[in-house]
Protein backbone atom coordinates (compact mmCIF):
# COMPACT_ATOMS: atom_id res chain seq x y z
CA UNK A 1 0.00 0.00 0.00
CA UNK A 2 1.33 3.45 -0.92
CA UNK A 3 1.34 5.48 2.28
CA UNK A 4 0.94 9.23 1.92
CA UNK A 5 0.93 11.97 4.46
CA UNK A 6 -0.84 15.31 4.29
CA UNK A 7 2.24 17.05 2.87
CA UNK A 8 2.54 14.53 0.05
CA UNK A 9 -1.12 15.08 -0.82
CA UNK A 10 -0.59 18.86 -0.81
CA UNK A 11 2.55 18.66 -2.96
CA UNK A 12 0.89 16.25 -5.40
CA UNK A 13 -2.03 18.66 -5.75
CA UNK A 14 0.40 21.54 -6.34
CA UNK A 15 2.09 19.57 -9.13
CA UNK A 16 -1.20 18.69 -10.82
CA UNK A 17 -3.12 21.94 -10.14
CA UNK A 18 -0.47 24.61 -9.42
CA UNK A 19 -2.68 27.62 -10.23
CA UNK A 20 -5.95 26.21 -8.92
CA UNK A 21 -7.33 27.81 -5.76
CA UNK A 22 -6.51 25.62 -2.79
CA UNK A 23 -8.26 27.69 -0.11
CA UNK A 24 -10.08 30.98 0.16
CA UNK A 25 -11.36 33.13 2.98
CA UNK A 26 -13.44 36.33 2.80
CA UNK A 27 -10.40 38.52 2.07
CA UNK A 28 -7.93 36.33 0.12
CA UNK A 29 -7.36 33.13 -1.77
CA UNK A 30 -4.29 31.00 -2.34
CA UNK A 31 -3.29 28.59 -5.09
CA UNK A 32 -1.80 25.19 -4.39
CA UNK A 33 1.68 26.28 -5.44
CA UNK A 34 1.47 29.43 -3.29
CA UNK A 35 0.26 27.35 -0.35
CA UNK A 36 3.21 24.96 -0.65
CA UNK A 37 5.67 27.87 -0.85
CA UNK A 38 4.11 29.71 2.10
CA UNK A 39 3.93 26.54 4.20
CA UNK A 40 7.56 25.72 3.44
CA UNK A 41 8.65 29.25 4.42
CA UNK A 42 6.76 28.96 7.70
CA UNK A 43 8.05 25.41 8.22
CA UNK A 44 11.64 26.56 7.66
CA UNK A 45 11.14 29.35 10.20
CA UNK A 46 9.51 27.02 12.74
CA UNK A 47 12.22 24.37 12.30
CA UNK A 48 14.57 26.81 14.05
CA UNK A 49 12.10 27.27 16.92
CA UNK A 50 10.70 23.82 17.71
CA UNK A 51 11.88 20.23 17.95
CA UNK A 52 10.20 17.25 16.32
CA UNK A 53 6.69 16.59 17.67
CA UNK A 54 6.44 19.92 19.50
CA UNK A 55 3.31 22.07 19.36
CA UNK A 56 2.75 25.30 17.51
CA UNK A 57 -0.21 27.31 18.76
CA UNK A 58 -2.23 29.58 16.49
CA UNK A 59 -4.35 32.54 17.57
CA UNK A 60 -6.30 33.76 14.56
CA UNK A 61 -9.44 33.08 12.60
CA UNK A 62 -9.63 30.17 10.17
CA UNK A 63 -8.09 31.69 7.06
CA UNK A 64 -5.57 31.37 4.25
CA UNK A 65 -2.87 32.45 6.72
CA UNK A 66 -4.03 29.88 9.26
CA UNK A 67 -3.94 26.98 6.79
CA UNK A 68 -0.51 28.10 5.55
CA UNK A 69 0.72 28.10 9.14
CA UNK A 70 -0.80 24.73 9.99
CA UNK A 71 0.90 23.09 7.01
CA UNK A 72 4.07 24.95 8.04
CA UNK A 73 3.92 23.36 11.49
CA UNK A 74 3.70 19.94 9.85
CA UNK A 75 6.66 20.75 7.56
CA UNK A 76 8.63 21.66 10.71
CA UNK A 77 7.87 18.24 12.22
CA UNK A 78 5.50 19.63 14.80
CA UNK A 79 1.77 19.68 15.32
CA UNK A 80 -0.63 22.56 15.64
CA UNK A 81 -3.47 23.74 17.80
CA UNK A 82 -5.77 26.49 16.58
CA UNK A 83 -6.99 28.54 19.53
CA UNK A 84 -10.48 29.93 19.01
CA UNK A 85 -10.28 33.71 19.34
CA UNK A 86 -13.77 33.71 20.86
CA UNK A 87 -12.87 31.34 23.72
CA UNK A 88 -12.74 32.75 27.25
CA UNK A 89 -9.25 33.67 28.46
CA UNK A 90 -9.28 30.95 31.13
CA UNK A 91 -9.94 28.29 28.49
CA UNK A 92 -7.11 29.59 26.29
CA UNK A 93 -4.72 29.55 29.26
CA UNK A 94 -5.65 25.96 30.11
CA UNK A 95 -5.03 24.86 26.53
CA UNK A 96 -1.63 26.56 26.48
CA UNK A 97 -0.76 25.04 29.86
CA UNK A 98 -1.42 21.56 28.49
CA UNK A 99 0.38 22.16 25.19
CA UNK A 100 3.40 23.96 26.66
CA UNK A 101 3.89 25.72 23.31
CA UNK A 102 7.07 27.73 22.86
CA UNK A 103 5.63 29.69 19.96
CA UNK A 104 2.29 31.16 18.99
CA UNK A 105 1.57 32.32 15.45
CA UNK A 106 -1.04 34.96 14.77
CA UNK A 107 -1.87 37.56 12.16
CA UNK A 108 -1.74 41.35 12.05
CA UNK A 109 -5.40 41.57 13.02
CA UNK A 110 -4.98 39.53 16.24
CA UNK A 111 -1.39 40.38 17.18
CA UNK A 112 -2.12 43.12 19.75
CA UNK A 113 -4.81 41.00 21.43
CA UNK A 114 -2.46 37.99 21.53
CA UNK A 115 0.29 40.09 23.11
CA UNK A 116 -2.17 41.38 25.70
CA UNK A 117 -3.67 37.96 26.48
CA UNK A 118 -0.41 36.05 26.66
CA UNK A 119 1.92 38.72 28.09
CA UNK A 120 2.52 36.69 31.26
CA UNK A 121 3.26 33.50 29.33
CA UNK A 122 6.68 32.32 28.24
CA UNK A 123 5.70 32.08 24.61
CA UNK A 124 7.08 33.78 21.52
CA UNK A 125 4.34 35.52 19.54
CA UNK A 126 5.01 35.96 15.82
CA UNK A 127 2.92 37.38 12.98
CA UNK A 128 2.59 34.99 10.05
CA UNK A 129 2.78 37.96 7.67
CA UNK A 130 6.26 38.78 9.03
CA UNK A 131 7.44 35.20 8.51
CA UNK A 132 6.20 35.23 4.92
CA UNK A 133 7.98 38.53 4.22
CA UNK A 134 11.33 37.54 5.77
CA UNK A 135 11.72 33.76 5.77
CA UNK A 136 13.24 31.69 2.99
CA UNK A 137 12.54 28.06 2.24
CA UNK A 138 15.32 25.84 3.59
CA UNK A 139 14.85 22.67 1.56
CA UNK A 140 17.72 20.81 3.22
CA UNK A 141 16.22 21.31 6.70
CA UNK A 142 12.72 20.39 5.53
CA UNK A 143 14.02 17.29 3.72
CA UNK A 144 15.90 16.18 6.86
CA UNK A 145 12.80 16.65 9.02
CA UNK A 146 10.67 14.66 6.58
CA UNK A 147 13.26 11.89 6.39
CA UNK A 148 13.42 11.70 10.20
CA UNK A 149 9.62 11.62 10.43
CA UNK A 150 9.32 8.88 7.81
CA UNK A 151 12.01 6.85 9.57
CA UNK A 152 10.13 7.20 12.85
CA UNK A 153 6.87 6.13 11.21
CA UNK A 154 8.45 3.13 9.51
CA UNK A 155 9.58 1.90 12.94
CA UNK A 156 6.16 2.46 14.54
CA UNK A 157 4.33 -0.69 15.56
CA UNK A 158 0.87 0.05 17.01
CA UNK A 159 0.49 -3.43 18.48
Residues covered by each model-derived region:
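Carrier-protein-dependent adenylate-forming modules in NRPS/ANL systems
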Residues: 1-159
Amino acid sequence: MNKKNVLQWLEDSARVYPEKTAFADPSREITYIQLVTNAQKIGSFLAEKIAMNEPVSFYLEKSVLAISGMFGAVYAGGFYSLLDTRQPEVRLYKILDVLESKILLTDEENFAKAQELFAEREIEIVKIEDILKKAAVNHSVLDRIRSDAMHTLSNFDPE
